[in-house]
Amino acid sequence: MEWNRETLVFLSQCFLNTLSPIPEPRRTAERALSDAADQANYGLAVLRLVAEPAIDEQTRHAAAVNFKNHLRSRWHPAGDSGISPIVDSEKEQIKTLIVSLMLSASPRIQSQLSEALTVIGKHDFPKAWPALLPELIANLQNAALAGDYVSVNGILGTASSIFKKFSYEYRTDALFVDLKYCLDNFAAPLTEIFLKTSSLIDSAASSGGSPPILKPLFESQRLCCTIFYSLNFQDLPEFFEDHMKEWMGEFKKYLSSNYPALESTEEGLTLVDDLRAAICENINHYIEKNEEEFQGFLNEFASVVWTLLRDVSKSPSRDQLATTAIKFLTSVSTSVHHALFAGDNVIKEICQSIVIPNVSLRVEDEEIFEMNYIEFIRRDMEGSDVDTRRRIACELLKGLATNYKTQVTEVVSLEIQRLLSSFSANPSANWKDKDCAIYLVVSLSTKKAGGASVSTDLIDVQNFFANIILPELQSRDVNSFPMLKAGSLKFLTMFRSHIPKPFAMQLFPELVRFLKAESNVVHSYAASCIEKLLLVKEEGARGNRYAAGDLSPFLLQLMTNLFDALKFPESEENQYLMKCIMRVLGVADISAEVAGPCIGGLTSILSEVCKNPKNPIFNHYLFESVAVLVRRACERDISLISAFETSLFPSLQMILANDITEFLPYGFQLLAQLVELNRPTLSPNYMQIFLLLLSPESWKRSGNVPALVRLLQAFLQKAPHEVTQENRLSQVLGIFEKLVASPSTDEQGFYILNTIIENLDYSVIAPYMKGVWSALFTRVQNKKTVKFQKSLVIFMSLFLVKHGQAYLVETMNTVQPNIITAIVEHFWIPNLKLIMGSMEVKLTAVAATRLICETPALLDPSAAKLWGKMLDSIVTLVSRPEQERVLDEPEMPEISENVGYTAAFVKLHNAGKKEEDPLKDIKDPKQFLVASVSRLSSASPGRYPQIIGENLEQANQTALIQLCNAYNCGIA
């Protein structure tokens, strides 16, 4: 794109039109710019437009944003993105112009160009842009001399961005080369501008300097502190060790001085606090990483920070300062210099002057509780409050307890008693004191290793529960003091394993009652408490503490209240309520009396969310709830299946007909579950869906593939006769061939193939086997992966145990005569020992045993070595310790908070396919192995011990002897 008057007019008009509120000119302009972006020198032309003073600010700002985004996508595009990169000659011109243009721009445009410069720096600095740092330093020094702090701050902001990588990237030689270059060139100019600005602040402050003078100076110091953090993050540089006294002296001054001219306004106070918070980050880093070098400054900083915290108000605008300052004291408390806190009454004073004020509820907390219950729960129950005052203050106590556990326990216990006494004196006025006491107990409890159980030294849990928590839970008014109710429910949830079962059973009706609370937090906490109680394991036993019979007396009321709670404003898609529904349905006895209202309630919600799927976690638990209800109700009473179909089919058909992308994988999994529960013959509704499965269009979205495979397996299992009609099996195998050809879907292809082998007669599949083997062997030659190799071993094993070694060898030989020996030697033997999972190990071990004991080609004397090596692999497989083979699956994996519909596939745990053991009659593959080899050897005495001695590893020979002894079988 050539830079001329015509280009200027074209681009400026386009950028102006992108700001239009009218859709048509806006879209036309966006398309024109998108097309122009493919031309060489487009980025350069846009940058020149940004610098054109004749163009209005609004248009130039739009151009600056476009320039930044253009660089993001095209400076260094991913190799497979298909986006054409900016050419090197254009890059060099942009790098030559951008610094000077950024510094001369207005603040809004300067901000965009600084970000654009950072994009370039991320890829090119310093190696491919050696001129950048000298140019920044020269401009910084010139701007400082001129007192131009707009430019100073622009340069420091840019430097802060390009140096930021040193604070988060892993230590590598390349990173340290870059860091050394930056330190060698920038550490001295940084110190110079920091000290110069500091003297300007001192001068302005002493003469009553006005906010307009002080504001850019304080912003400059904050930026210097962020750069200091990045440059000091990896190691303590020699330069900063030599100049530590100057830096620490200034840091201490800003933490201990007041600046009334700025602090009298909220904006000015925020500016000062941001600098102080950045300083606290730096000294906290020094105490953690450079403790020895920093120790001379430690006492003064601890004293200054403590004093500062006493004066920091509860205003949310001061939260960042409060949390970073408390973090510093926490780091000191766990360091070797913790003796600073050993003095008389020090811990008591910290508790009273720092911890309690920061743990106590604020008006802002109450507002979040009432106005944004999801955010409140995330902070309070789910731990996203990691940087809130409440959490950080409790972390300080935990830090102190590292070395002074007895003193901390005594002080906090007394403080809890004081708070509770205050509440008792006037409950309606002092309810926040009780909330504070409960919060302290819950937050300072420690989780025991390897489980959800928690413990605390602050209180006797059962005593505290009976006297402090229980009265709240037994309150007849579920809507009074909702924050206290929520705190009490949280306490019960946290200490659920401590509450004896008989006591907890008396509480269940109270929890059911709290589901009717109007507060979204309270009914969410009640649901969460019930859900977590149902997961409690009985100590010393494998099962859960609470079973179906425990829920029966109040099950109907529980389900009614859960569904009613979903009608409260803003709880229509409450994930905690839906998760509780899912958990209860997974435990309770599902009679027809319960199943009817539940399926009605769930399908009503399902039809509603189909209109606008927006909460992936809620929707996942909704589908899990449907799946568990269908599974458990129909296991108990198969006659319910038709009623469930009547209820569910309208929603499932809506998902399919409207192509609701987010729900298609769930819909296919539910349909698979319904197909599996049916008895032959399947209704026409299902067969219509089966025909949809055969359409290539259905398989185009990768996220649908696992669910479609699951559904196809269900049809192969339940309607094998229908599947083989009208050339349908050929279409199914076409799907298999497409899936197995790709490493990303080959496992899914094997699921289909294995299901065909398990459910169709050999006479039906025989005509297709040459094509199947050809597809598999082609894949072996082209893209061999460990996953594919294991899947193929399992498939060959399944074929053998279902249809016999003769048919296995015969069908393989249609591809190439006598291929079986090559497959055994080069593929089966090396990959057999990779198999994991108890059922898979049994299947492959038994199949391999039958292969060497029944296959003529392997029993031939010329194949003795092959026979021995295969036996060696079998012994390796069956001798491996059980824990190496497979890990226990959790009952139900937790759904991640960031689960989304863009994920490839989200499995429904409760609609999972039941794995059938194809070898139910064989209990022990080890016994089968030695018995089979023993029988074989008895027919040819003396032959096999020699083969074993020559071909088995010594460890496997020993293992085989041990197995023979264990099962009383000999090898003659």
UniProtKB/Swiss-Prot annotation:
PROSITE patterns: IMPORTIN_B_NT
Annotated InterPro entries: ARM-like (IPR011989), ARM-type_fold (IPR016024), Importin-beta_N (IPR001494), XPO2_C (IPR005043), XPO2_central (IPR013713)
GO CC terms in record: cytoplasm; nucleus; plasmodesma
Subcellular localization, as worded in the UniProt entry: Cytoplasm; Nucleus
Signal peptide bounds: none
UniProt keyword terms in alphabetical order: Cytoplasm, Nucleus, Protein transport, Transport
Biological processes, Gene Ontology terms: intracellular protein transport
Cysteine-cysteine disulfides: none
Chief place of localization: cytoplasm
A Pfam family assignment: CAS_CSE1
Molecular-function annotations in GO: small GTPase binding
Span of domain Importin N-terminal: 29-104
Source domain of life: Eukaryota
Protein family per UniProt: Belongs to the XPO2/CSE1 family.
Role this protein plays: Export receptor for importin alpha. Mediates importin-alpha re-export from the nucleus to the cytoplasm after import substrates have been released into the nucleoplasm.
Subunit structure: Binds with high affinity to importin-alpha only in the presence of RanGTP.
Protein name, as recorded: Exportin-2
Organism listed in the record: Arabidopsis thaliana (Mouse-ear cress)
